[in-house]
From Swiss-Prot:
One of its GO terms (biological process) is phosphorelay signal transduction system. The keyword Protein biosynthesis does not apply. The lineage of its organism: Bacteria, Pseudomonadati, Pseudomonadota, Gammaproteobacteria, Enterobacterales. Residues 481-500 bind DNA. This is Anaerobic nitric oxide reductase transcription regulator NorR. The modification 4-aspartylphosphate is found at D57. GO terms for molecular function: ATP binding; ATP hydrolysis activity; DNA binding; DNA-binding transcription factor activity. ATP binds at residues 215-222, 278-287. The gene is norR. Coiled coil: none annotated.
């Protein structure tokens, strides 16, 4: 068997038929799998010494979420270094990155593997991988035929990446015009909700607008901020992060605007604030809704006039900073109740973005699970970490109230449990390793705090009740004191004092 002109023409036609890049890539590898009669095919993008799957056929869905580092996958490293067709012998000692990831063949090792590096000029931009359970599957195809396939795929991938670069406005005025692949932001997901969010990020990134990023706790608002900064002309300058909820009122102004020597007790030298550090760059203010009204007024002045004043200094400093703010609160409601300034809200929300909760992202759960499995594999020095079909279904059926952060913790916990019950360096995650309805769900049954131990008097009963209420609020809000205070409808400072009196904190 060999490639006919008709087969090669068919591959080229498929690359033109797709509506978008993703569709074209999927058509390409599906066609290749059929033509080569192999068990699995994948198109990978190369960036920062790792391969990122763009399209797969015949592989488990979570492969799309995995990131294959060269250091962790010697076969892919060999493909990256070769510069030509790579054929791995059936008895190769090098582990295949897809071992255990071919549906229906989870317990078997891949036998035949061919790798085709893809180039744009002299730059490695990706690879095609072809795998089969039959050892001699690819022997009937010559290297020259496989090079033709690689050339077609490389052309399609190069064009797609160049268009992506131009659409994201990464080809800045005054740049050399040299092709430079856009760096990945780890925003993994192909669901309609995530696709829409990525489009909105591309639209706003190239502008200089302030952006308000909303979404539940654990959805990945910081990743959105990083993606906006990375796609902006300010990307060559710093992205400075500040968690407003972690700021004590006494030092919040100094953290934002800096201070001069002697401004207050302990100010032994001049110190720049976050705005100065972010000059000509971007400042990301996480949990912006936790700022006091007094600080909100000072922040508004910076957004209006671009001037800051260090604590203890009469002089003003000019700064050029783009502000990205994030919150899990409904700031419109906060404005109505007087807890957030309406003028600041309107300044920040010129282009609002909303990060969807994980329960609305469908199969993205499996992609993210694959990403976290690969992270655990590298961190723990394991040869492979894979999800069983039952585990995938289990993850898809769960509601994920803690969103992506909860999924990450659940995967890490499951790997540790599975590793403890299985000898060797290969881990297969089963549904029972998660036990999500009981063990991982962050909100305990509502009646749990009612089953209190018998107490001698009213005061002791009241204190026990308060302790349990605070513990539950903290558990439900990822130990975020500000969010827990809101849930309990009390002031965060009062909550800290009460917790200290009840012995819940030092």
């Amino acid at each position: 068997m060999s490639f006919s002109v008709e087969v090669l023409a068919g591959i080229a036609i498929e690359l033109q038929r797709g509506i978008g890049h993703q569709d074209r890539f999927q058509r390409l590898i599906t066609t290749l799998r059929q033509v080569l009669a192999c068990d699995a095919s994948a198109l990978l993008r190369y960036e920062s010494r790792q391969f990122i799957p763009l399209a797969i056929d015949g592989l488990a869905q979570d492969v799309l979420g995995r990131r294959f580092t060269l250091e962790g996958h010697p076969r892919l490293e060999a493909i990256a270094r070769a510069g030509d067709v790579v054929r791995f012998p059936a008895d190769s000692d090098l582990p295949d990155p897809y071992d255990g990831l071919i549906p229906g063949q989870e317990s078997l090792k891949v036998h035949a593997c061919v790798g085709l590096p893809l180039f744009a000029g002299q730059n490695l931009i990706g690879a095609l991988t072809l795998d089969a359970m039959t050892p001699e599957q690819f022997e009937v195809f010559s290297d020259e035929e496989l090079r033709l396939v690689a050339a077609l795929a490389a052309g399609a991938l190069s064009n797609a990446l160049l268009i992506e670069q131009l659409e994201s406005q990464n080809m800045l005025p005054g740049s050399s015009g040299v092709f430079e692949p856009i760096k990945e932001t780890h925003m993994i997901g192909l669901s309609p909700a995530m696709t829409q969010l990525k489009k909105e990020i591309e639209i706003v990134a190239g502008s200089d607008l302030n952006v308000l990023i909303g979404g539940e706790t654990g959805t990945g608002k910081e990743l959105v901020a990083k993606a906006i900064h990375q796609g902006s002309p300010r990307a060559v300058n710093p992205l400075v992060y500040l968690n407003c909820a972690a700021l004590p009122e006494s030092v919040a102004e100094s953290e934002l605007f800096g201070h001069v020597k002697g401004a207050f007790t302990g100010a032994i030298s001049n110190r720049s604030g976050k705005f100065e550090m972010a000059d000509n760059g971007t400042l990301f203010l996480d949990e912006i809704g936790e700022l006091s009204l007094a600080l909100q007024a000072k922040l508004l002045r910076v957004l209006q006039y671009g001037d800051i004043q260090r604590v203890g200094d009469d002089r003003s400093l000019r700064v050029d900073v783009r502000v990205l703010a994030a919150t899990n609160r409904d700031l419109r409601e906060e404005v109505l109740t007087g807890r957030f300034r309406a003028d600041l809200f309107h300044r920040l929300s010129v282009f609002p973005l909303f990060v969807p909760p994980l329960r609305e992202r469908g199969d993205d759960v499996v992609l993210l699970a694959g990403y976290f499995c690969e992270q655990c594999r590298l961190r723990l020095g394991l040869s492979r970490v894979v999800l069983s079909p039952d585990a995938r279904r289990h993850l898809l059926n769960y509601g994920w109230p803690g969103n992506v952060r909860e999924l990450e913790h659940a995967i890490h916990r499951a790997v540790v449990l599975a590793r403890a019950t299985r000898a060797g360096d290969e881990v297969i995650l089963e549904a029972q390793h998660f036990a999500l309805p009981e063990d991982v769900l962050p909100a305990p049954p509502a009646e749990s705090f009612l089953a209190l131990p018998t107490c001698r008097n009213l005061r002791e009963s009241t204190e026990n009740f308060q302790r349990e209420m605070i513990r539950q609020a903290l558990a439900q809000n990822n130990h975020n004191w500000a969010a827990s205070a809101r849930a309990l409808e009390t002031d965060v400072a009062n909550l800290h004092r009460l917790a200290k009196r009840l012995g819940l904190k030092d």
